[in-house]
Amino acid sequence: MPRLLALLILIANLAGCTGFLDLKHDLKTYQDTITHVSGTLAAPDCPSCAILVVALDKQGQPLSYKVFEHPGRFDILVSPRAAKLFVFQDINHDIAFNPGEPYAPHTLPSAHPDGTPLTGIDLKLSAASSPPPAGTYPDGNLFALRNRLVAGIDVQLGSVAKLNEARFDPERASMGMWQPMQFLKAGLSGIYFLEDYSPNKTPVLFVHGINGTPRDFAELVSRIDRNTYQPWLFYYPSGLEIPTIGDALLNMLNELRQERHFNDLHIVAHSMGGLVSRSLLNTCRLESECDFVRTFTSISSPFGGAQAAKSGVEYAPVVMPVWRSMSPEGPFLTDLFSTPLPAGVEHHILFGFRNVATLSATSGDGTIPLDSQLRHAAQQQAASLRGYDEDHLSILRSELTGTYVNAILSRVPPRQP
C-alpha cells in the first residue's frame, strides 16, 4: 500500500477513527439531498435583467431559489422534493413575481434518481397578459428563502461573526472535509461579515483552503485598512468538488449583490481557496457576470494540483470529491486556465518557499511544491508574482504579506455608485 494512502488513513483515524466510513455515509446523504439542475435561460424582453430560478414542490410552495445576473447558462441545486421550476425576471427588484414580469414554468421529471443531474433544460422567458395558474409560481416575497441553499439547508449571508467563535474551530474544518453534508446541515457555510455592512467600504472576500476556516486569516485581516475595506469571509465544506463550491459562492455573491448593491469586491484566497476563486472567475467570464470583482490575490495556491490527491483518487477506499478536483491530470485542473480572467480583473500570485517538511526535499512551502504554486499557465495570466520566505501557514501571518495585500487593494480606486 502506498505510503500516501497510509497517511490518508491515519488522517481519517485522527479525525474520528471512522473518517472514511463517515465520508461514505455523508456522500450518500449528499446524493439523497441534492440534485443538480442545469440548462439555459433566454429572455429577449429584457436581456440585461436579473433572473430568479425558483424550485417548487408539488403544491407549488417555494423550496429555494437562485439569482442570475442575466440570461445564459444556469445551474442550480435543488431538493429531490422539487417538482417544478418557475423562472422569472425580477424587474422591480422586490424578490417576488409580479404580473407583467417575463417568466417561464417548467415541470421536472416525476422521478429523478438520487444524485443524477438534470441537464439540457432550455427555457425562454416571456411576458403574458395574465398571470400563470395558481400553484405554478411562488406567491409572495421570497426573501425568507434568501439564506437557503436547498430545502433544509440554510447558509449565512452577511451574518456578523467573530473569528474566535466555536464555528470556526479546527474541528469544524475537519467536519467540512469528512462530513460536508453535516457541515451544510449545521448551517455553517456562507459569507460572514466581521462588522455591519457599510456602503462606504469596499468588501474584501477571504477564501480559506482545504481543512481551513476563516480564522486562518485572523492576522491578515487585522492588517487590512478597516477604514476603507470591510472583510467578508467565505466558509465552506472543503471536501466537496471545487466547481460545486465555486458555483455556490457565485450564488451567494449574486444574492448579496441583489440586496446590498455593492459595486466593487476584492478576493484574497489561501491555498485551495485560490482554486475555488479561479473556478468562480471562470464562470464569471463564461457567463459575463461578476463585473464587481476588481482583483484576485492568491496565496500559496496549488494551481498545479497535488499528487496526494491523485493517489487518494486511485487508492483510498472512499474518494473525497475534492481529490478529483485537485488531481493534477484531472479535467478540472487541466481546463482551469483555458478560460481567461474576466476583463479588468488582475491576478496577483503570492507564494512561499520555506520548506519546513522534514520528509520532503521538494522546493516549496512545506505543503505545496513551488512548481504547483507557480504553474506556468497561472504565471502567464498574472499581473504580479511575489515570493516570501514563509511556510504554508506563516505566510498568512507575515507583516510583508499584509503590506503587499494592502498595496494591491489600494491600486484600484472604487467605482462611483
Task: State where each predicted segment sits.
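Positively charged n-region of N-terminal signal peptides that target proteins for export
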Residues: M1-L4
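Helical cap/lid subdomain of alpha/beta-hydrolase-fold lipid enzymes
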Residues: N282-P417
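Active-site catalytic motif of lipid deacylating hydrolases and related acyltransferases
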Residues: Y197-D264
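Active-site signature of alpha/beta-hydrolase-fold catalytic machinery across serine-
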Residues: E219, R278-T283
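Structural recognition of the beta-strand scaffold that forms the well-ordered cores
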Residues: P203-F206, Q230-F234, H266-I267, T295-I299, ...
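Flexible, membrane-associating and regulatory peripheral segments of lipid-active enzymes
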Residues: C17-D22, Y30-R73, L77-P80, F86-V204, ...
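Bacterial N-terminal signal peptides
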Residues: A6-A15
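Gly/Ala-rich beta-loop-alpha elbow adjacent to hydrolase catalytic centers
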Residues: V268-A269, G273-S277, S300
